[in-house]
Amino acid sequence: MAKDSSFDIVSKVELPEVTNAINTALKEIQNRYDFKGSKSDIKLEKEVLVLTSDDEFKLEQVKDVLISKLVKRNVPIKNLDYGKVEAAAGNTVRQRATLQQGIDKDNAKKINNIIKEMKLKVKTQVQDDQVRVTAKSRDDLQAVIAAVRSADLPIDVQFINYR
């Protein structure tokens, strides 16, 4: 009997890359003329980004700078879940952005449905925060990878442990 091939579908954000992107974004904010004298800041608290600025307009500018730096570092911005803009101390506004690590149950079901609609001989298992796909044929697995990549999912997915 031939050995089954498999791979895992995961959704991870590399925290060191996020830290590097925050540092370069803060450098740009300090050097930009339109941010001179403003109280703009970005902090990483565990897996939550806290954006702070003088007003909502500057907060959007801070967010744009951060997103551009995250994209340069290949950090998936789909995995950022922005909260509401709220008032903070000292006439500033704050917004929290949560980094989503792992695949939650709803997105795992969506991925499962995408794979089942293909009607290939593959098996899927939801394991905690990842989805394992197993099949006899590697061609089927590559077709699954192509289908999941082309699907419009609310999170960014990576494929690991391809065996």
UniProtKB/Swiss-Prot annotation:
Nucleotide-binding protein. It comes from the Bacteria. The keyword Nucleotide-binding applies. Belongs to the YajQ family. The lineage of its organism: Bacteria, Bacillati, Bacillota, Bacilli, Bacillales. It comes from Bacillus anthracis. This is Nucleotide-binding protein BA_1166. Keywords: Nucleotide-binding. It holds the Pfam family DUF520. InterPro entries: DUF520, UPF0234-like_C, UPF0234_N, YajQ-like_sf. GO terms for cellular component: cytosol. GO terms for molecular function: nucleotide binding. NCBIfam families: PRK05412.1.
